[in-house]
């Protein structure tokens, strides 16, 4: 099958009323949520409930290649029927995925989604409190509750939830039917641009402090050991109340093409 060129993300021209969906969430028993099978991919609580799964899936939340089978637990709830009916026979799986407060999904790629003719992954945020950050190719995807987004998750992505509330998305895998590909293309024109991560924004604020303060620049300029430079930069950020990681420092060093001390000279 010929490969189709897809964007990193696209907000589809679909919107959903949140109130009935949130009420339907409340009707799900607490014991129905199961831990995600990729236990090495996350820290904290990453759990889910399957609405539709492949009949040969080894676990309810795991992928499979068989025919889609609907779980019994939601058959009496019209809310889920109404939403899922809009995807017709393109729908291969549907899962509610919850990332608990203080939890994170480590960066990874879903390589099976990048193959020719592979399923298209859609996210419909239901609960997404401030403090949730979904990074795709290192940039925040500005998904809002009630929207529907296509995400190319064969690319590097990670999620963190720094809030005190759970983040819950309805995640759909769909066949690449023509109408869905058209909706993805149509949505690109109005898709908000991804933003730098909060850590990158914090790191850029530190750069501003260093550019204005020759003393800070000198403290870094005298360091010749890479690890010592990174550690000093992290401490400097902490002293200023700026949260970022060694990854942001290393990225700046790579962009500096080796002259990682020279880039800190006050200008």
Task: Tell what function each PLM region has.
Residues 182-267:
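Terminal, compositionally biased segments used for targeting/anchoring and flexible tails
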């Amino acid at each position: 099958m010929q490969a189709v060129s897809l964007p990193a993300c696209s907000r589809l021209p679909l919107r959903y009323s949140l109130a009935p969906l949130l009420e339907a969430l409340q009707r799900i028993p607490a014991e129905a949520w199961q831990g995600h099978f990729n236990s090495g991919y996350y820290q904290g609580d990453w759990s889910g409930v399957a609405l539709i799964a492949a009949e040969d899936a080894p676990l309810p939340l795991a992928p499979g290649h068989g025919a889609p089978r609907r779980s019994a637990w939601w058959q009496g709830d019209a809310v889920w029927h109404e939403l899922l009916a809009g995807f017709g026979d393109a729908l291969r799986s549907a899962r509610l995925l919850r990332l608990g407060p203080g939890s994170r999904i480590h960066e990874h790629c879903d390589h099976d989604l990048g193959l020719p003719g592979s399923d298209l992954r859609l996210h419909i945020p239901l609960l997404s409190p401030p403090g949730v950050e979904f990074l795709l190719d290192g940039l925040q995807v500005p998904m809002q509750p009630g929207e529907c987004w296509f995400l190319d998750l064969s690319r590097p992505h990670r999620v963190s939830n720094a809030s005190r509330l759970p983040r819950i998305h309805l995640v759909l895998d769909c066949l690449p039917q023509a109408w869905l590909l058209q909706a993805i293309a149509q949505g690109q024109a109005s898709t908000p641009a991804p933003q730098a991560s909060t850590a990158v924004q914090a790191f850029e604020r530190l750069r501003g402090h260093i550019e204005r303060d020759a003393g800070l620049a000198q403290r870094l300029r005298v360091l010749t050991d890479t690890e010592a430079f990174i550690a000093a930069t992290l401490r400097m950020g902490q002293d200023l109340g700026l949260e970022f990681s060694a990854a942001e420092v290393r990225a700046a060093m790579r962009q500096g093409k080796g002259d990682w001390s020279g880039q800190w000279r006050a200008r």
